[in-house]
């Protein structure tokens, strides 16, 4: 796995597994809301009244509605914050 995805995948997986409502802001300013149904290397499947496939390159920010733990013994991501707080040993 690429070093750049060592935080992205656990974060998205925690949001998916816990069904945390998220706001996803796109690079063009559009705000999408829903829960993450699935994701892969290139897309996120967002579910609200319908499922939407959103390309990751179009995503600017993912904001969870509540705090989410990232990884076992890892830090957390605060809701409404652009700051990720994680253990120092996970960051190079």
Swiss-Prot record:
Domain Sm: from-to ranges: 9-68
Keyword entries, A-Z: RNA-binding, Stress response
GO biological process: regulation of DNA-templated transcription; regulation of RNA stability; regulation of translation, ncRNA-mediated
MF annotations from Gene Ontology: RNA binding
InterPro entries: Hfq, LSM_dom_sf, Sm
Gene Ontology CC annotations of this record: cytosol
Family affiliation: Belongs to the Hfq family.
Role, per record: RNA chaperone that binds small regulatory RNA (sRNAs) and mRNAs to facilitate mRNA translational regulation in response to envelope stress, environmental stress and changes in metabolite concentrations. Also binds with high specificity to tRNAs.
Quaternary structure, from the entry: Homohexamer.
PANTHER family in UniProt: RNA-BINDING PROTEIN HFQ
Designated name of the protein: RNA-binding protein Hfq
Lineage: Bacteria, Pseudomonadati, Pseudomonadota, Gammaproteobacteria, Lysobacterales
Gene of this entry: hfq
């Amino acid at each position: 796995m690429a070093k750049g995805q060592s935080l992205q995948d656990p974060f998205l997986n925690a949001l998916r597994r816990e069904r945390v409502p998220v706001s996803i802001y796109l690079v063009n300013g559009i705000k999408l809301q829903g829960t993450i149904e699935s994701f892969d290397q290139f897309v996120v499947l967002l579910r609200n009244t319908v499922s939407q496939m959103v390309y990751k390159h179009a995503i600017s920010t993912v904001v969870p509605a509540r705090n989410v733990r990232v990884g076992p013994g890892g830090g957390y991501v605060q809701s409404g914050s652009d700051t990720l707080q994680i253990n120092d040993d996970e960051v190079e």
